[in-house]
């Protein structure tokens, strides 16, 4: 049943990408298609005559779509094919990521369905609701699909270095590829630094502090391979600063009163809205029913976090570290937005979707057989 529901979602995504692009297009979405055409016409990944509002990306959906535009001559068809292709690669990467964490197939497929079906917010067009998660990962624009793919491979490589504490030729090649991708992603903005690199660095600093007995004990040399890898990602960001691909717009630190109010009220509200809890639904209506289900789902996530990080837990260290990294990413984003004048847009917290999907997968994996009825309910 879970697999069938997932296929239905994927079929809907394919249909929307190929046949409903014009119905849901806006200025931001149209700009992605126009950029794809411009890249092909000028034969330049970052055309000089293209004026970017916030960033000049080197890799992104338009980069791939430009190839299909050259083949088809249609911006709409090119974007549709590209979004289907990249969405499939993204879901395949996420599935591979979950399986490498030793999660079973039912748990992994459930997580994929959660990622496709969970967010209930978005914008309406002719009575149809298009959740923002689909715009970010599956439909029309796919702004953060490359960040998601890089995140999953980056976490897996980090965990591998922490556990094996040695570097093979294959590992060195993987390191080099991830470093190059980090440079390219960072050239287009600070999102990669914010949602991938900084959370990994924070996680590593805390881990080193605890493993070294509060800096009193010396750790084996191989343990610092993971630290070196994260250091190289920071270097990748510094190298990308030479490119100058970010928009020159000012962000200011808030005064303490404003920062506390934003951290305690605005940011949590944005995270809740990110899941679809927007309010303004008449009690008894379908919208109110969906939002009640979302509240129940958030309670489930709270239980999942407790289950994963409790002292007597049968959850593996890999699974704990992965959930910890994803939650840290949400925390880093919340902190940066909370203390600055940056807009607290709900879709900036898209990492909560990944964290939620992994938490559900872990619960399904470990409760199946022990609490089969509860696992089936999830």
PLM regions: where:
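Hydrophobic/aromatic-rich transmembrane helices and adjacent perimembrane loops
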Residues: 142-144, 194-195, 293-299, 303, ...
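Membrane-interface helix-loop-helix junctions at transmembrane boundaries of multi-pass membrane enzymes
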Residues: 166-171, 208-226, 300-329, 340
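Short hydrophobic/aromatic helix or loop-helix immediately within or flanking a transmembrane segment
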Residues: 31-37, 51-74, 266-279
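Signature aromatic-anchored transmembrane alpha helix within multi-pass, membrane-resident enzymes
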Residues: 1-7, 171-180, 226, 230, ...
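Membrane-interface alpha helices of multi-pass inner-membrane proteins
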Residues: 171-191, 196, 201, 231
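Transmembrane-helix motifs of polytopic, lipid-linked glycan transferases
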Residues: 3, 81-110, 153, 302-307
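Membrane-proximal lumenal/periplasmic loop motifs of glycosylation machinery
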Residues: 18-27, 40-63, 77
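Membrane-interface micro-motifs in multi-pass membrane enzymes
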Residues: 25, 58, 105-162, 342-356, ...
